[in-house]
Structures are given as C-alpha cells and as structure tokens.
C-alpha cells in the first residue's frame, strides 16, 4: 500500500516535541501495567474506589469547574468543540475523552493538545503508590476481596491530577460509559451535557433505552449549597429518553436547556471542507459560523456545544458570548476519525462510527454532501456491537464492502463479518482481507477499476471513494497506517 506509512505514530508530535525512544518505552510499560486491570468495558456500580483515591490526592477535581458530557453518540466531537470555544474565550482548558484513536496520551489534553508521553508517565508514577493503597483497601474490604481499581478509574484520576497540576481554568470531561457509576462522576459539574441517546453497549448497559437514559442522566447532579443551579443541556432525544432526563433534572433542581426549544440549528449550508451555520444559542443568534466538519449531526453537536459554553459562562437573554470568539473557536475545531479525509484521488475517509446511529449519520452525510458514483467501505466491527444494524445503515451508500480485522481481540472475525455482510449486501458486493492494510489495497483496486468504467468516468477518481469505518479501533488503526499523528 504505497500511499500509507506503517510506522508507529509519533505520540508526542502534537506537543511540538518528538518523544525519545526511552519515553515511548516508558509509555508502553505504563500501558502494559494499566492493561492488567479491569478493562474499560467492565463496570462495577460503585464510586467508592475513585472517590477514595481523589481524597488521598487532595480532591484535584474540585480545584477547577467542569463541563461534563454523557450520551451515546457525539460525545467526543462535542467535547472537542467545547474545548475550542472555551479556549477562544481565553480560558485554559483540560480535556479528557475516551477511547483513544492511536495513542493513550490523547485521553488527557491541556490547552487543546495531548500531554506528552513523558507527562503521561510522570502523572501515572505520581499517583501509583496511592492507587496501590486503594487496591489493597478494596481487596481487603470486609474480607470480600473486592476489585482493584479499574483501568478507567486510574486514567480518570490521572486526568484530574494533570489538570490540577497545569493548572487549568476549565475541565471538559467526557463520560467513559453510562454516567451514574462512571469514574468521572466524582466531579460536581455546573453544566451537564447529554448528547443523543440510543442503544449501545447492550452487554453492559442493557437494551432498555429508558434505563440507559437513567444511567446517563446520573451526571446531572445537585449544585452545592450557595452555588447557582446546575444546568442540564440536552441534545435531541426520543420522547421516552427526554422524559427520563427531565425527571432527573427536576430531582437535582437543575435548570434545563433543550435543543429545538432553548437553542437550535437555524440554518446550515454545505461548504468546502465543512459547513456554514447559523445557530440560535441561549444568548441569541450566532451567524456565519464555519465548522470544518461534515454532516448534519455535527451541526447539532455544534449547537449543543455552544449552549453548553453559554450555560457555563452564564450567557442568556441579556448576555451573549463574543461572536468573533465563537466563530474563531468553531473554525479551529478538529475531530480526528470523524469523517476525516486521509487522501484524495481517490478520496479516502475514516470514520469511527461503531453503532447503528453513528453509521446512519455517516451514511446520511455521504449521500447528501458528496457526489460519489462508486464508494467502497472497508469495515471491521467489534463483536459486541449491533453488527447487522451497522451493515443495514451502510448498505445503501456502499457499492462494495471489504470486511477485515482491525487487530483488536474484541473484533469480529473476518469470516463471521463476511457472512453477516453477505446477507445485507449480497455475496457479490463483499470482499475479504485478513488485515486492514490488505483491505485498503483491495478497496483501492476496486475503485481503480470503477474509475476506468465509462459509467463512472468523467471526474474519474473524484467520483470514487473509500470509507474505512466500523469502530474507533478501525479508525485509529487506519489513521496510523496513513501516517497521521495523534491529536
């Protein structure tokens, strides 16, 4: 695959400093240690361990206010938009998101950039003795042999400690999974953001959407005495979910701002490299906003982020955020792995869609914002996902699909994915490849052949494309193959 680079990603380039081999080795060692703990997909409904660790660390999460983001789809994009807006308003930010695409350092960002491998390792080593103490206490608790701290709990503690050390003015905190029992819920955020909720992580959160909403609504917490009410900023939801979220907001005495009621997307126009928006915020109308991301769903993410930042700064009917700062913030937004272009001629996109809702948003964007005449999907999906739902959403926009394996032990094997794809696409439209690199080569051959077809030719390669999708792991692995640095 001549157009890609198979070397390891430069885990520190986003900071402007290239990490040394020793620093990379230390980072890998820390990751190995963290991987010995409970994985992020395993939930124990308790905040006892993370709360105890925060107490030992001096409650770093209380040293700055936070904007807390839960939901099913769009959390990371909203978090990155909030980060960019707050930065444009001259506040120092810390941001923690999950999972990472390429390097674990992406999970902890300060001033909009991932911390360096050296900082990541130093932060872990700083809290490591206290983590060991909590492990011992938990395992000895009441003689029951409780669990040690999970990987995500330790990562969350690292982020909160790094933010306090920086120090930051505002933390932008994305929930890992769920909300109520998520390790991030040791904060008491003045602004709780809920992106659209759908069914995902069925093995861990269940298949009852009202129950899922109840878990995610757990981040809407009562404000401390003497503080302004918490504000719940809620994106578009189905009625059953909205009912749960509003009930939780009442319980927490939280003010509520809902999309299409208190804020809305008024207008969007497709533009080169993204879209131009007119948004109704809590403080008024913001016009001529260029967002360098594709898709109607990103416009809704943008207005959700705007309302969240307005709520944080107290904007409302009598006070609007600075319009130039808002425009500058949105113009600076990046969201790696979200319909991100890797190359042109033929066009290659990667997208981290990993559930039916995400796949539907991807398909809608491809159908409405591009003029492809022949499009090939490269697909690897994790085995615990709704594979058929993802395939059903993508089938109308992909002429062919190449199914493969992204290297994750959780990924569905190629044979099983090919069988599922054949049922949706028909066997003639399905190809297989053992690994992602080979799959991209197969897809490239397919678009080369299509470009030579007189029914497609005219704009040739500009009318053919490849989309690599199916999971965050797939998008991250592809990003590394194309030589992109972690962001």
UniProtKB/Swiss-Prot annotation:
Organism taxonomic ancestry: Bacteria, Bacillati, Actinomycetota, Actinomycetes, Mycobacteriales
Q: Can you tell me which residues bind ATP?
A: 74-77, 301, 338, 351-354
Please tell me whether the keyword Manganese is annotated for this protein.
Answer: no
Domain remark text = Is folded into two distinct domains, an N-terminal ATPase domain and a C-terminal Rossmann-fold domain, which are joined by a flexible linker.
Q: Which SUPFAM superfamilies match?
A: MurD-like peptide ligases, catalytic domain, MurD-like peptide ligases, peptide-binding domain
* Amino-acid positions noted as binding Mg(2+) 2 in the UniProt annotation, renumbered to this chain: 201, 203, 384
Q: What class of enzyme is it?
A: ligase
> Cofactor stoichiometry and binding?
Binds 2 Mg(2+) ions per subunit.
Q: What's the protein name?
A: Dihydrofolate synthase/folylpolyglutamate synthase
Pathway per its UniProt entry is:
Cofactor biosynthesis; tetrahydrofolate biosynthesis; 7,8-dihydrofolate from 2-amino-4-hydroxy-6-hydroxymethyl-7,8-dihydropteridine diphosphate and 4-aminobenzoate: step 2/2; Cofactor biosynthesis; tetrahydrofolylpolyglutamate biosynthesis
Residues that coordinate or bind 7,8-dihydropteroate: 44-46, 150-153, 181-183
